[in-house]
Amino acid sequence: MLFRIWLEGHRERIKPRMIPGNTLPEELRENALRPLRQLNAYYAKRDPELADDCIDETILPDDMLILGTCPGEIFHGRKWTRHLLQCDWKYWGRLTLDVEKCALSRAGTALYFVLPAQVRLDHFVFSIPIRITGILEEREGLWYISKLQFINNLNTAYVIGAWIAALVMTASLLLGLLWVMA
């Protein structure tokens, strides 16, 4: 199972699936990518004390909505955005955003973005591909993140297969122990 996750993550790094976006004027694209580059820099530092600085520079905290990789991870507002950033930086792993491969699409006055990323979990030796989607909004000439969704970019069939294999192996071990003890 771990090999399959590693292999899929490796494939995504070598030949990532491209996501189409709009062709935007270069100046607009560069300005819109500013908060994503800054967010990437803060994730590289992984300093929980910098969570408020990160929010002030990259995020619209009052409108912020973040959906994490787990079903129960729904964060709204400044307090919960700070909580997510601090926990990610303390416990999750090293997240690297591939900002240059970000696809941007106009959505009225806002921009929708999709970008590939990798997370190297602290206690494992492999990276998991992540896809991050969200909304950028312009305020006073600067772009800020107002919505984020982190998505595990893995084939869930591998996870289900691993669970089934683990259950079969556990049942086999228990039956073997019962047979030896009889």
Model-derived features: where do they sit?
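C-terminal single-pass membrane-anchor helix
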Residues: 156-182
